[in-house]
């Protein structure tokens, strides 16, 4: 029996563990660990014990295997999954630095310049066989009490590895998912193919007045607020694609990704958000201090803009979102966000930046 370690105990981690338990039965053991600084979900699940996976194609009870000790969690694991937001990835990597990871593969699910962060933090001699990054998570999902809902299973999603994997290793990795995997040529393409910074910030900024005025219940995020901001969403997506073209990377439009992942009959992006059932019950954040701004803007879009400037691409829509988000958070995100300088790439040219995003 093979083993995977899942670092994080949020919606994705628990859904992934339940999926492995129900779909792969006794073939794979999934062990969950969470940082000691953020164990609310971890401890709550421990108190519940057995959870119920509720999915579109299969469901059933499973008992997550929780491990308090990081060393024990990753011991003999062929694959180690980071299932935490960008903000938490670096902290976990700094805890992993004390261990020899040279016989494992590290996966950021999803990735966010994780290959670059690994290179900056992990010792070369103890680094993983490869780092794999994905554009998105395999599912739209959330846990409510003891029920873990797979709201939508993506038909496929995109991944890239920093090193060439053997056929056997690739097959074992792909078998962990119910989805088809599309392999991109490099992790840099994955970083710029994350559509969260395109969709989330415009939606929550449109919702600002309703959130701050305490409206209850709030309209649903994808049903109401994202469609209301669709012009800005589209502007951001167009700028994202311009950066990709300038850097010679690969990607697709945000709407193409939505259709590829979830299917449906929508003919344009606004219609997709208004009609896709997997998003129907996704609520709107009740505070503006939310990862839609603190992660998607501060830690991803700011870096996109800095790279765009080096590549000679004009991104006025992104800059306006960053400024507006900064006003909401009372920060100058161009100063406090994740920057080229903070990633040891100050003064780098586009070729060096792409190389670094690929973990080199």
Swiss-Prot record:
What protein is this chain from?
Vitopine synthase
Q: Which SUPFAM superfamilies match?
A: 6-phosphogluconate dehydrogenase C-terminal domain-like, NAD(P)-binding Rossmann-fold domains
> Could you list the residue ranges that cross the membrane?
none
* Alphabetical list of Pfam families matching this protein: Octopine_DH
Q: Which organism is it from?
A: Allorhizobium ampelinum (strain ATCC BAA-846 / DSM 112012 / S4) (Agrobacterium vitis (strain S4))
**Record's Gene3D superfamilies?**
N-(1-d-carboxylethyl)-l-norvaline Dehydrogenase, domain 2, NAD(P)-binding Rossmann-like Domain
The record's InterPro entries line, in alphabetical order, gives: 6-PGluconate_DH-like_C_sf, 6PGD_dom2, NAD(P)-bd_dom_sf, Opine/Lysopine_DH, Opine_DH
Looking at its record, which EC class is this enzyme?
oxidoreductase
> Do the record's keywords include Oxidoreductase?
yes
Keywords from the named record:
Crown gall tumor, Oxidoreductase, Plasmid
Known EC number(s)? 1.5.1.-
Q: Which gene encodes it?
A: vis
Family membership noted in the UniProt record: Belongs to the lysopine/nopaline/octopine/opine/vitopine dehydrogenases family.
Which Gene Ontology terms cover its molecular function?
oxidoreductase activity
């Amino acid at each position: 029996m093979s083993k995977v370690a899942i670092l994080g105990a949020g919606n994705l981690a628990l859904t992934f563990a339940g999926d492995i338990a129900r779909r792969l039965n006794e073939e794979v053991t999934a062990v969950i660990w969470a940082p000691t600084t953020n164990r609310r979900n971890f401890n709550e699940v421990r108190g519940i014990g057995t959870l119920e996976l509720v999915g579109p194609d299969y469901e059933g009870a499973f008992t997550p295997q929780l491990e308090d000790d990081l060393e024990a969690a990753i011991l003999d694991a062929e694959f180690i999954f980071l299932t935490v937001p960008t903000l938490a990835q670096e902290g976990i990597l700094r805890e992993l630095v004390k261990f020899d990871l040279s016989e494992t593969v590290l996966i950021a699910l999803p990735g966010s310049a994780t290959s670059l962060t690994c290179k900056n933090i992990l010792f070369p001699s103890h680094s993983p066989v490869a780092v794999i990054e994905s554009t998105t998570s395999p599912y739209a999902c959330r846990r409510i009490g003891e029920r873990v809902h797979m709201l939508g299973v993506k038909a496929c999603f995109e991944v890239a590895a920093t090193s060439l994997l053997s056929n056997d290793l690739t097959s074992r990795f792909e078998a962990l998912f119910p989805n088809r995997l599309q392999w991109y040529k490099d992790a840099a393409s994955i970083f710029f193919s994350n559509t969260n910074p395109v969709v989330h910030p415009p939606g929550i900024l449109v919702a600002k007045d309703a959130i701050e005025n305490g409206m209850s219940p709030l309209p649903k995020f994808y049903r109401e607020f994202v469609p209301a901001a669709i012009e800005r969403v589209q502007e951001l997506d167009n700028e994202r694609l311009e950066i990709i073209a300038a850097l010679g990377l690969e990607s697709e439009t945000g709407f193409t990704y939505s259709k590829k992942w979830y299917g449906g009959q929508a003919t344009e992006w606004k219609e997709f958000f208004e009609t896709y059932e997997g998003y129907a019950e996704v609520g709107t954040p009740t505070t503006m201090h939310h990862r839609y701004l603190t992660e998607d803007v501060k830690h991803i879009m700011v870096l996109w803009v800095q790279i765009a400037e080096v590549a000679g691409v004009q991104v006025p829509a992104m800059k306006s979102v960053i400024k507006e988000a900064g006003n909401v958070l009372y920060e100058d995100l161009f100063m406090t966000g994740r920057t080229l300088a903070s990633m040891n790439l100050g003064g780098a040219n586009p070729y060096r930046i792409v190389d670094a995003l690929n973990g080199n």
